[in-house]
Amino acid sequence: MQSSLPLCREFFEKITAYLDYHDFRLTITANQPSITLPYYVDEKAHSIELIIFKTTFLSLFQEAHTYFNKTFSDQSGISNENIYYMTVGFLLTTPENKTVYNVHEDLLKRYFQDNSVLVIPDLLVKEVRLIQRLLCSSNNRINKSSSLWILYRKLFVLSLDANTLVLPDILFVFHSSGSQHFSNYYCWNTARWFYDNLPYNKRIELFNLTKRFCFQNVKDCSSWSALAYMVCQQEEKKTDNIRDFQRLTSSFNVPFKINKVDLNFQVQPADAFTQELVKWIDRTYAADWPPYLCLLQITKFNITLRIEMDSVLLTWRNEILNFEENSGHIKMINNTPIVPEKFSNDLLTSVNFAHFGYKKLFLNKFLDKNKKEQSDS
């Protein structure tokens, strides 16, 4: 049967092509007068970029929307494949449409139980690539769609089935999606979920990727918060993530035996990471708040670490006193160190004001937290 959704189907075929390419970029951009094709593929040696022009994007939405209305008014000529392509069009253009999202998920469930429901070769492999590539797109609404991130979790669960030869490339997705959009909460919150449910060897890989990302993106508070969580997991949140994973395996009838050793495996002891982070802050003269907040969050959930932090606190306090003696008092506005005007053209001193200012803020918050807990006890 010829597709009634040529744009939606072509988009699906384009975005799920090159299955062996992990570095696949989806870009939505303004029309280019020199290009008349609805989609443009920029093929490089090690990466692929699929470019969708604005006119195509709007036409694709109109095509999916028209077909959506038809499915409710006239059921004749409706095929599961066309419904699937319609939902793909909506996942691109309006990913938070819950009605369409539910239709899409229902089709996946039915297909997983009976492959004849959708006559699309290698559908689950293509579905995983589709969602991964949407999550790595240049479009903020797609990249930060909570519905797509939840669907990605479900596809991971489906991929665990013994009959499914597909494995989501989670490391590339988190790095690419996190790099595309600064402080992507849904991306790094999903990373927490994966971290709590991955086998220990994959957990190590995710932890190392997150740590590298943070050290390379010092201002990204969402990734630093995820890193703090991985180092010192909150038991309640961890339990919620594990229960959600178990709920999904049950929902999709995926047999999966929990490995308690995996669940309780700690990638890097909190004290070892804390020492590494403190050395990194000192060595790089970190002049942004997220690394300090990460350190603060880790000590919040580990009483032993607070005692071991005494020598660090003393060293930092002396550094701050020496700096203020030579350069003047560090003033803060809305928890941000202010560089005096006379040093505004002095890059080194300006960085030092930020560096020692955030150390001072850390000390104040650390001590305030301890005082509050002592008064509450």
Swiss-Prot record:
Present with 846 molecules/cell in log phase SD medium. May be involved in cell wall organization and biogenesis. Keywords: Cell wall biogenesis/degradation. One of its GO terms (cellular component) is Rab-protein geranylgeranyltransferase complex. The keyword Cell wall biogenesis/degradation applies. SUPFAM superfamilies: Protein prenylyltransferase. The keyword Lipid biosynthesis does not apply. GO terms for biological process: cell wall organization; endoplasmic reticulum to Golgi vesicle-mediated transport. This is Protein ECM9.
